[in-house]
Amino acid sequence: MNRISAISTLVTPLPLLPSCSFVPTRRCYPRRATPYSRRINLKPLTSRIVLLTRRRQLGQIVEEVEAAKKRYGRLNTIVMNSVLEACVHCGNIDLALRMFHEMAEPGGIGVDSISYATILKGLGKARRIDEAFQMLETIEYGTAAGTPKLSSSLIYGLLDALINAGDLRRANGLLARYDILLLDHGTPSVLIYNLLMKGYVNSESPQAAINLLDEMLRLRLEPDRLTYNTLIHACIKCGDLDAAMKFFNDMKEKAEEYYDDFLQPDVVTYTTLVKGFGDATDLLSLQEIFLEMKLCENVFIDRTAFTAVVDAMLKCGSTSGALCVFGEILKRSGANEVLRPKPHLYLSMMRAFAVQGDYGMVRNLYLRLWPDSSGSISKAVQQEADNLLMEAALNDGQLDEALGILLSIVRRWKTIPWTTSGGMAAVRLETLLGFSKSILRPHLLSKVIPSEPIESIMIRFEATRPLLGTLQLKNVAMRFFKEQVVPIVDDRGSCIGLLHREDCNNLDAPLVSMMRSPPTCVSTTTSIGRVVDLVLEKKLKMVIVVHCGNFSGSGYSSKAVGAFTRAQLYRLFESEQKLL
């Protein structure tokens, strides 16, 4: 009792807490970090690379990978394999090979069978078959880095690339050499026949793909869904829609007979048939197959299928049907952004309504192209959209509206290709407006005779005040505030290039490092008309004139005697209104 009371006097009494909120106090010690906790999570980087690969933004991938190397010091094989796949997908096999060698060299992160399969596929796509076979030989002989095993997956990657390129000769050679790895119980597998069928279709020999079916049946190989899809595609390429529908019906009958859902037609099957009926302009069959696709519970109609239906409707001349399907796409895309249409679908709709002269519909599609479409809108798509808007206004009889659109096109794009539908619409508009409202008024060279030699109107070369190429830009910078382009000469006085104002970006650099070389040269006997055409076609700011005997076409060894500038050309122009 005395001992207990002594201890109790040393302990400071604590305030009582309610029993429901009592929490025992416990001292916390920092936990020692385990090796697993120190691991770097690179999954977000891999997902980012996969996303950029789909967008074909290889430059952005390289930048982010280099930044990750500086941050983490070392990446793993999974990340670098995704980078290799990005290089192959974007068609840059040289960059893929360089990264592969960095991975395989001593001190690198190493390579595996996936790395080799990706490189083999890339070499096949680039048609560098000899290098691919050399790599396969090193794997076969066991001298390859990482000591991968020769497997069917490596062969299939190269085989698929060869078949996609239509190189069936080398594909058959690959099968003959490595048939032991690819044979299934002594006979070719269904996968091999599917690949060969696809190769024959890609090489414009669809009938040969259909003939392979008989060989499969003789070997007692049962066709799968991919086989039937390839056969249907081959029949459509041959223009035999009846045979395509026969395979389609056989496919459904076998699926019901064997209770095999993997034999049921999928969205690829229906999309292939839709394209076939669209090419054949068979609207009734197209509507039937589209209705069947919508009623099929196991088929999810994706953006590709919807786009194919709209294009097929337009080919059949049913703009109302195409508009209904297009509206359904927009309605479904509100709940599922994956279904948002691509820009080229908007262009297809705009082309159809522009021909009909439905300016209101084309304008609505034009305004919704930017906010409602999915993916990037390229410069070519923007130009065509502007041209279609002008064409629709012209076909609708709204000449003033079409003229305003044409003015905006000229201000924005500076040029109109005459071979396009927009160029033809501009020509029609110019014809209807005449000289009174034309924005493309001709300018005549009334002050000179185009057949005369350029020597008669050129500026003497000394008058252009050329600069020595060894001078630094900071010593002559004020010269480019007054002139857009200046000739550059060497120590012997020969013109070696032209320095433009927009290329002057380093004050401490010599002029020769920034000039454009060689300069465009013409002889003194070249006609004025030919030089004018050259300046306008290539948008040149200056042309160097050399003696006929010294002309070599490059300007490096030619003694310049004169120059002709764009400013001179503008002074020679005279508007047609002054001549009327």
UniProtKB/Swiss-Prot annotation:
Keywords: CBS domain, Repeat
UniProt keyword Repeat, yes or no: yes
Alphabetized GO MF terms: mRNA binding
All copies of domain CBS, residue ranges: 486-553
Coiled-coil annotated spans: none
Extent of the PPR repeats: 76-110, 112-142, 151-181, 189-223, 224-254, 266-296, 302-337, 342-376, 382-417
Signal peptide: none
Pfam families the record matches: PPR, PPR_2
Xref: PANTHER family: OS09G0431600 PROTEIN
NCBIfam families: PPR
Record-stated family: Belongs to the PPR family. P subfamily.
Name listed for the protein in its UniProt record: Pentatricopeptide repeat-containing protein At5g10690
Species the sequence originates in: Arabidopsis thaliana (Mouse-ear cress)
